[in-house]
């Protein structure tokens, strides 16, 4: 599996959070595509 994106934490700037969430969505897509 690809590495899970690092959670930037509660006090991270909004652009870091946005980057994290898009990376997380991409990560989940990769995993679910492999599983099914």
UniProtKB/Swiss-Prot annotation:
It comes from the Eukaryota. It is found in: Secreted. The modification Tyrosine amide is found at residue 36. Keywords: Amidation, Hormone, Secreted. The keyword Thylakoid does not apply. Pfam families: Hormone_3 (PF00159). Gene3D superfamilies: 6.10.250.900. Coiled coil: none annotated. One of its GO terms (biological process) is neuropeptide signaling pathway. The keyword NAD does not apply. InterPro entries: Pancreatic_hormone-like, Pancreatic_hormone-like_CS. GO terms for molecular function: neuropeptide hormone activity; neuropeptide Y receptor binding. PANTHER family: NEUROPEPTIDE Y/PANCREATIC HORMONE/PEPTIDE YY, PEPTIDE YY-RELATED. Elicits an increase in arterial blood pressure. This is Peptide YY-like. It comes from Atractosteus spatula (Alligator gar).
């Amino acid at each position: 599996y690809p590495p899970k994106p690092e959670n930037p934490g509660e006090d991270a700037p909004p652009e870091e959070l946005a980057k994290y969430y898009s990376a997380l969505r991409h990560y989940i897509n990769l995993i679910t595509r492999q599983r099914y």
